[in-house]
Amino acid sequence: MRDYDEVIAFLGEWGPFQRLIFFLLSASIIPNGFNGMSVVFLAGTPEHRCRVPDAANLSSAWRNNSVPLRLRDGREVPHSCSRYRLATIANFSALGLEPGRDVDLGQLEQESCLDGWEFSQDVYLSTVVTEWNLVCEDNWKVPLTTSLFFVGVLLGSFVSGQLSDRFGRKNVLFATMAVQTGFSFLQIFSISWEMFTVLFVIVGMGQISNYVVAFILGTEILGKSVRIIFSTLGVCTFFAVGYMLLPLFAYFIRDWRMLLLALTVPGVLCVPLWWFIPESPRWLISQRRFREAEDIIQKAAKMNNIAVPAVIFDSVEELNPLKQQKAFILDLFRTRNIAIMTIMSLLLWMLTSVGYFALSLDAPNLHGDAYLNCFLSALIEIPAYITAWLLLRTLPRRYIIAAVLFWGGGVLLFIQLVPVDYYFLSIGLVMLGKFGITSAFSMLYVFTAELYPTLVRNMAVGVTSTASRVGSIIAPYFVYLGAYNRMLPYIVMGSLTVLIGILTLFFPESLGMTLPETLEQMQKVKWFRSGKKTRDSMETEENPKVLITAF
């Protein structure tokens, strides 16, 4: 009885076939990058003020002073949600009284924007906010729109694995790409905010399902050494490339419906990939479809110019026949030790996710050009992923994760000390904070997989990554705090990031340790506060095995 990797070892690790699969599966992630963050431009809120109807009998002086001023970032700007009572100032205008000279504006009664709003078109021509007036009393709908997209992501993460196990990796990959692209196209024809949001939930379900299945397909087709780079650099970097394309599209297409139409084009361009990306041979074997699996391996061998054995898979022989004890979610809380570690992991994943998505969603709200800021927010992710990969190869996990979290949280806290006029420095600090948090986020899959025993490893990664989806759902409300105080989101995110950095130091170290197979082995892992070494841990230090991939 042989292992699958042993059977196909003759193919090699990095031939033309593997390079093609690596590139095509990574490229299929690009639409996820801009769909996942498209809401920052689709639901952008431009400057706005109460509309004063042309029919109002006002002098030019009163029309120019019909909206009260408020202080924002040290300067006076027109109020966004109120105006002076129109009937009152119309009477003053008819009497020939001048605002500020004959009438004290501070004593005038105010009213809400009964005639709607005037929206600035300096940044956006139209967004869903301007389409359905999602401001003032309805401004709560903007973060809810984003949160519901991530609710769809959460739902999709639950079903994507089960669907791909049932119907095959390739079928589900392209079906979910079609869902993501098709429902994005349908959003163009939304006639209400409710319709747009419901469709957005479905787009979120397709977005994460496509991402997860592409990840699974790559790890199953590619060899062990290539899986490391694919799971850390390939998928993440191409996601960042898609994220960088978003502000480029949005800069030239400033109408939200046309932007959505443009964002569906790359999804359509992925259709030809169907004829180049094969089904997972591992999945075919699990379905006892040996002939189809052999055909794929033979084509791969031909592409790599390698001779094929007469028999690759023996239909009588079972691959990977080991039977594992079934695990339940309660196993993650079976003992005090594993329960504490699980709770700590849930907090670490959730709050790191809050920091990552809140900073990403807040990028257009920074001073300066919204499109450039969003592009920089995406660009900084590429060196963050590369740095994380390099650090994971040699350095202790808990220390490097804690270090980048301290870095990210510390610079976010420092922003409040920067004068308002030094906005370039503030933007630079935000990007450095994004760098640290993104690096930490990309390390969590590896760290979590190394901590838990084989029995519950996949479940642990699944449950903790679900906590990150919860973090993404609440992240828009951290951005929303900026409506009350410009610095509040950074103070809250910075404080929480530093706290979870401290929490990370209390995890056991996994670098150089043999992966635990049972819960009993996990219980003997050395904790930060303990200076004692168990005999097992000392043995593993003499014969270390390093895992630098999530699977």
Curated annotation (Swiss-Prot):
Supply one GO CC term from the record: plasma membrane
Biophysicochemical property: pH dependence: Optimum pH is 6.5-7.0 for ergothioneine uptake and transport efficiency decreased at more alkaline pHs.
Q: Which residues lie on this side of the membrane: Extracellular?
A: 42-141, 193-197, 254-257, 359-371, 421-426, 482-486
Keyword annotations of the record: ATP-binding, Cell membrane, Disease variant, Glycoprotein, Ion transport, Membrane, Mitochondrion, Nucleotide-binding, Sodium, Sodium transport, Symport, Transmembrane, Transmembrane helix, Transport
Identify the InterPro entries for this entry. Answer: MFS_dom, MFS_sugar_transport-like, MFS_trans_sf, Orgcat_transp/SVOP, S22A4/5, Sugar_transporter_CS
Q: What is known about the tissue distribution of this protein?
A: Widely expressed. Highly expressed in kidney, trachea, ileum, bone marrow and whole blood. Expressed in small intestines. Weakly expressed in skeletal muscle, prostate, lung, pancreas, placenta, heart, uterus, spleen and spinal cord. Expressed in testis, primarily to the basal membrane of Sertoli cells. Expressed in brain. Expressed in liver. Highly expressed in intestinal cell types affected by Crohn disease, including epithelial cells. Expressed in CD68 macrophage and CD43 T-cells but not in CD20 B-cells. Predominantly expressed in CD14 cells in peripheral blood mononuclear cells.
Q: What is its main location?
A: membrane
Q: Which residues are glycosylated?
A: 57, 64, 91
> Where found in the cell?
Apical cell membrane; Basal cell membrane; Mitochondrion membrane
Protein activity control = Allosterically activated by intracellular ATP.
Task: State which ranges are Cytoplasmic (membrane side).
Answer: 1-20, 163-171, 219-232, 279-337, 393-399, 448-460, 508-551
Q: Where does ATP bind?
A: 218-225
Recorded catalytic reaction(s): these are: ergothioneine(out) + Na(+)(out) = ergothioneine(in) + Na(+)(in); acetylcholine(in) = acetylcholine(out); (R)-carnitine(out) + Na(+)(out) = (R)-carnitine(in) + Na(+)(in); glycine betaine(out) + Na(+)(out) = glycine betaine(in) + Na(+)(in)
Q: Provide the induction entry.
A: Overexpressed upon TNF treatment.
Gene Ontology molecular function terms on file: acetylcholine transmembrane transporter activity; amino acid transmembrane transporter activity; amino-acid betaine transmembrane transporter activity; ATP binding; carnitine transmembrane transporter activity; PDZ domain binding; quaternary ammonium group transmembrane transporter activity; secondary active organic cation transmembrane transporter activity
The miscellaneous annotation reads: Mediates the Na(+)-independent and pH-dependent bidirectional transport of exogenous prototype organic cation tetraethylammonium (TEA).
Q: What clinical condition does the entry mention?
A: Rheumatoid arthritis: An inflammatory disease with autoimmune features and a complex genetic component. It primarily affects the joints and is characterized by inflammatory changes in the synovial membranes and articular structures, widespread fibrinoid degeneration of the collagen fibers in mesenchymal tissues, and by atrophy and rarefaction of bony structures.
Which protein, by its recorded name, is this?
Solute carrier family 22 member 4
What is the primary gene name for this protein? SLC22A4
